[in-house]
Regions:
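Low-complexity, intrinsically disordered or signal/transmembrane-proximal segments
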Residues: 23, 30-32
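Cationic, amphipathic, low-complexity segments that mediate targeting or membrane/lipid association
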Residues: 8-12, 19
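Extracytoplasmic cell-surface/polysaccharide-interacting catalytic and binding patches
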Residues: 61-149, 161-267, 277-288
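Beta-rich nucleic-acid/ligand-interaction surfaces
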Residues: 153-159, 272-279
Length: 288
């Protein structure tokens, strides 16, 4: 008897599929047994297990094939209406983990309620693509990882309201003064991570498929202190506060970004601007 399992799998939920899958071998397969011995029982068990694995593999394949892309949020759709682009559609293999979509950032709050994609102006995204190419030409095992990109001025105002009057205020551009280059789509907060698509000659992944952890750079992104200052790196190394690996990785990041036209912010090793503030005010619009 032929059972149209693929059609069934597309129209049932997982619980229903699992139930039928467990019944499938016994209801639709007849095993020829020469003798009712423990050995034959063992082979029957192995055959059933193999069939179950095959069935669930087909279910997974169908789920992947029929999976719908995650719908874009209102903020993300609005970003695109402003002419901004999702950087993952421009920069091959780049990784994104927006730190203000979580609470583990220097303000300690979730600032991006429905923003998970990183957006930039098209020319900034194209420059980031060049930076990724430059990085992987020098270090094929690495990739860029973005922690923040375009930040709407409305969010900038919320951040300013949180830090105003505190020691943290020097790290947030005052909206009354025009904000910062994040508000124009002309800046990124970025680090290095391992690529998760490289394989050995034997086909083994060099790094776990889900391992896109940022490399240690001496401080976390958003660290408020002198160890994040680019100009003091050598002194921090001499004091033993930064390692040789930290200095090398920061240099690799700067080399790649500067090759594409970005400039590092001297007090934040992770922050890169694509234009000056004067250029932004003269030629670009703030993302509200």
């Amino acid at each position: 008897m032929e059972f149209p399992f693929a059609i069934f799998a597309e129209n049932c939920n997982f619980v229903e599929i699992a139930f039928v899958a467990t019944q499938f071998p016994l209801k639709f397969i007849q095993f020829h047994r020469f003798n009712p011995t423990p050995l034959n029982d063992f082979f029957m068990f192995i055959t059933c297990c193999a069939l179950l694995l095959s069935i669930f593999g087909e279910i997974h394949r169908l789920n992947v094939a029929n999976a719908k892309p995650i719908e874009k949020s209102p903020t993300e759709l609005w970003m695109e209406e402003q002419g901004l682009v999702d950087i993952t559609t421009v920069v091959p293999g780049i990784h994104v983990s927006l730190m203000y979509a979580r609470s583990d950032n220097f303000v300690g709050r979730v600032m991006y309620r429905d923003l998970r994609r990183a957006y930039l102006l098209p020319e900034t995204a194209e420059a980031l693509k060049k930076a990724q190419t430059a990085l992987q030409k020098a270090h094929p095992e690495l990739s860029l990882k973005v922690y923040d990109a375009t930040r709407p001025m409305s969010v900038q105002q919320q951040m300013w309201n949180i830090v105003a009057g505190t020691s943290k205020s020097i790290y947030v551009s005052n909206p009354k003064n025009g904000g910062g280059l994040h508000n124009y789509g002309l800046a990124v907060d970025i680090t290095l991570c391992w690529r998760n698509d490289l394989r050995t000659a034997q086909g083994k992944l060099l790094h776990a498929a889900g391992d896109t952890t940022g490399l240690s750079m001496g401080t976390p992104i958003d660290y408020l202190g002198k160890m994040a200052h680019v100009r003091d790196e050598t002194a921090h190394f001499q004091r033993g506060w930064l390692s040789k690996a930290h200095l090398e990785r920061r240099k690799w990041l700067r080399n790649a970004m500067e090759a594409a036209g970005f400039k590092v912010l001297p007090t934040e090793w992770w922050h890169f601007n694509f234009k000056t503030r004067a250029q932004a005010k003269a030629h670009y619009k703030i993302v509200r």
